[in-house]
Swiss-Prot record:
It comes from the Eukaryota. It is found in: Secreted, Cell wall. This is 36 kDa cell wall protein. Keywords: Cell wall, Secreted. One of its GO terms (cellular component) is extracellular region.
């Protein structure tokens, strides 16, 4: 979902 995409469960 997140366009940047960090170290998360997105």
């Amino acid at each position: 979902k997140d366009l940047x995409h960090r170290d998360d469960k997105t």
